[in-house]
């Protein structure tokens, strides 16, 4: 009995010291999360993980392709300074209605009416169209807003034709900031808001301009000489009263959105075709020297 009780501490390892090499190994080892293997998860689960990783890489390639080009959607060719002039985009309001933040965009004054610099308008309009096309390419929700009754029918038809949304009626304050309380927790806010008119009347800014700035929603807006461009992410100085100018804006935005959605379909089809021809290839998606922005 004494012998068994004396052997019991040796069996349990009481008083035993770990070798020094194991202590050094434990001190240098850094724990990291173990990656599940096929043996632990099974072949079906491992196949699902591989398919999800492949789909993620596929989507990343599609989304990153337009970022490799400065003008992937060729929006620069949609208009010219001459076309802006013919649509009377350069005509502003009287000098007495001028907003002080619009002075950098004014070329001069003629017969007490401000004249907008069309060179700056062309630059800002190209940036706005390019951003809108990128948003449509990434399947974002685009909302057109205007309070001008004269162009309500035109804007609603344009938004419907390009597969987007429009709001041309009275805009209730808090529809963006309190959207979860008004419409439920599953509501999705627009990814981009385009203001074809940023004023409710000649002096009152649209309520959605302020709410979009509070919710960090990017905005594109046509700002006349009596508008405040500070809260607009991509302001486009131009006439927002002439029917020719508003028709031009609608045509340009509709063309940019439609072209971006068509490019998305073409790029997806091209990558799927290349994936079928070269399975498992992680190289460049298109041959060196090929410019997809002009080939699609």
Curated annotation (Swiss-Prot):
Family: Belongs to the universal ribosomal protein uS2 family.
Record PROSITE patterns: RIBOSOMAL_S2_1
Cited function: Required for mitoribosome formation and stability, and mitochondrial translation.
Species for this entry: Homo sapiens
Alphabetical list of InterPro entries matching this protein: Ribosomal_uS2, Ribosomal_uS2_bac/mit/plastid, Ribosomal_uS2_CS, Ribosomal_uS2_flav_dom_sf
Region (Disordered): 274-296
HAMAP family attached to this UniProt entry: Ribosomal_uS2_B
Official protein name in the record: Small ribosomal subunit protein uS2m
A Gene Ontology cellular-component term: mitochondrial small ribosomal subunit
Family annotation (SUPFAM superfamilies): Ribosomal protein S2
